[in-house]
Amino acid sequence: VYPHSDIDALFDAAQQAMPGWAQASVRERIGVLMQVVDVLYREHLFELAHAVMHTAGQSFNMAYAGSGVNALDRAIEALVYAEQAQNAVTPSARWERQFGASQIMLDKTYRLVPRGVAVCFACASFPTWNAWPSMMASLATGNPVIVKPHPATILPMAISVRVFRQVIAAAGFDPNLVTMALDTMQDPIGKVLVQHPKTAIVDFTGSVAFGQWVERNAYPALAFTETAGCNTVVLESTDDLEAALRSLATTMCMFSAQMC
């Protein structure tokens, strides 16, 4: 049985953890998060693969790849993009302009300001696939994260959150930069999290219906959604019907029919 936290307390803790993290340099934040990647890979990868197997129902190979090494690839990619975006902002600039006989000169300084608390929804089928890069992107840019796993796949995200918190604390920062909000299918809290007044970012992966609700109701929070996809196939002609049918069957059934 997992503990259930008070939602307002989670947001308060996240906000209190943010100032020290925001004051750290981009390089320092990225370094801490790369350490998270290293610990997940070296110490927890097989544990996480089995956790996904026994919650999402995937084969070991699929869990190891889709919710393991490939998800870590995506986490690192998010860190790269976050570093590039932040380093593209110059720390200072001098502006000069002539107004008649007067020369106006301004020395400008710029600083990166986090948006605020991010809420990350992890999906039921591939819990870490989008959650890890989402968490990394928010944290790398100075934002604390509240993780909301799907009730069916809490274990892999609980392991992940524990690792994030341990590494962040070991680096001297407040571990409440990463927390977890749990619910059940009978008593969901997703809408409460999305519409909480302290929510600044919503990153949702899951059903089309709730994803559309998030897109309509997340404002003024910044919202990102990835929902299920289903593509139609028009078979115009083929010179090998058996091979074509085999390919279509593989497409429909691959990844235990869980991949979007």
Give each language-model segment a name.
Residues 29, 142, 178, 202:
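Residue-level signal for inorganic ion chemistry
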Residues 132-136, 190, 211:
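Generic hydrophobic/aromatic pocket-lining and core-packing "Φ" positions
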Residues 1-103, 137:
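N-terminal Rossmann-like NAD(P)+-binding subdomain of aldehyde/semialdehyde dehydrogenases
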Residues 163-172, 209-260:
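ALDH superfamily catalytic-core signature
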Residues 84-171, 228:
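Conserved small-residue-rich beta-alpha loop and adjacent elements
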Residues 107-108, 179-200:
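A structured beta-alpha segment of the ubiquitous adenosine-cofactor-binding alpha/beta core
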Residues 145-148, 203, 224-225, 234:
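Short hydrophobic alpha-helical runs that function as membrane-insertion/retention elements
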Residues 127, 184-188, 209-210, 231:
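Short acidic loop-to-helix transition motifs that present clustered carboxylates
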